[in-house]
Amino acid sequence: MSDLVSRPGLSERTARAVADRLAGRAGWRNPLIFAGPAVVASIAYMDPGNFATNIQAGARYGYDLLWVVLLASLIAMLFQGLSARLGIVTGRNLAELCRDTLPPALTIPMWIISEIAAMATDLAEFLGGAIGIALLAHLPLMAGMAITGIVTYGILLLDRRGFRPMELVIGALVGVIALCYLAELLIVPVHWRQAALHTVLPSLPDAEALTIAVGIVGATVMPHALFLHSGLSGARVAPQDAAQRRRLVRYSNIEVLAALGVAGMVNMAMVAMAAGAFHPAHQGIAEIGEAYRTLSPLLGAGAAVIFLISLLASGVSSSVVGTLAGQMVMQGFVGFSIPIWLRRALTMIPGFVVIGLGVNPTRALVLSQVVLSLALPVPMLALLWFSTRRALMGALAVRGITAIAAIGGAIVILGLNVILLLQIFGVNVPLPG
């Protein structure tokens, strides 16, 4: 292992396997050791916010907006790949690079905005898990929130044993979500030909479809996922030369394609399930609880329970990931962090306040997405700037077609976020043409 420096969290066995792979001594198991960061980050694309948006899209417009999910998934792959590359090449996360490179007049506001975004993210994910538990166990929502908090804290304690146990648990929950939606597709009558057609044929039936499309794409690249992915990728190993860095980036790109590909297919399955189950007879469904209560009489209790299990796995796993991202944001921007139990407790408070005040959980989810839309330019533009700097990234600086695609993706995401905010505040945005 002399040709590679391992970072805390790698077991001796894993570190040896990493060294063998980077030295070109391949084994059948070795590629699996690089899996983890993208799997964890992919949870951001299967969180309860995605559930609500995709259910609304499928219920109201059938398969018409599947192409939007495909576009969103491709953009997500690009930016998560850039985030992982940044961590591998520099050994630092995005927040640390901002602190070390930019003046305090910029980094302090960036930190505050990013912390608010992390709390807004955790609010949505925490509420999603709580809704799943409450509906599944027939408990009050407050009780569901308390159980969600305890479960997520228990998973977070695994971090004391290194990042691998945590990644395995998150990966297992990703598998649960994927299997649940595979089962749903076997139960729900899906028109596969229409689904395939609308995946590649863009269409916007009316102005309201634009609103939902913006909601799907505009919330795709999550601020906390960009911070977290760079940190997890940089925390693995310290490559000793350019060849090792290139290999790590290549393996990372493969993992991003696989993990985000699964996330994209899960999102497409959500839309297809909602289209097959609810469209056109139940077009007005827009809330998670309403979808659950409608599924049971339509397709049986089994379909409804599977839906809740997937929601629970999504809420718990994404809440864990959101807490980890919040820790990384604080550590990166200001150089210190608070105990994980304290952050978990603090991020639970807004959820209890929201529900205690009688705010509709779905409304709270929507408001959290507004906050994320406002915060998104901070990590996205910083990531683009760092990724294209040859002085920082060397030969792995993003350029050419990749740079053009990244800039184009940023313009699409930021433009759609502006449209989303305009629509939320009552400004009517007409369809093009």
Curated annotation (Swiss-Prot):
GO terms for cellular component: plasma membrane. Keywords: Cell inner membrane, Cell membrane, Ion transport, Membrane, Symport, Transmembrane, Transmembrane helix, Transport. Pfam families: Nramp (PF01566). InterPro entries: NRAMP_fam. It is a multi-pass membrane protein. The chain crosses the membrane at residues 32-52, 62-82, 101-121, 131-151, 168-188, 209-229, 256-276, 296-316, 345-365, 366-386, 401-421. NCBIfam families: nramp, Nramp_1, PRK00701.1. GO terms for biological process: iron ion transmembrane transport. The gene is mntH. Belongs to the NRAMP family. One of its GO terms (molecular function) is symporter activity. It comes from the Bacteria. H(+)-stimulated, divalent metal cation uptake system. It is found in: Cell inner membrane. Its main location: membrane. This is Divalent metal cation transporter MntH.
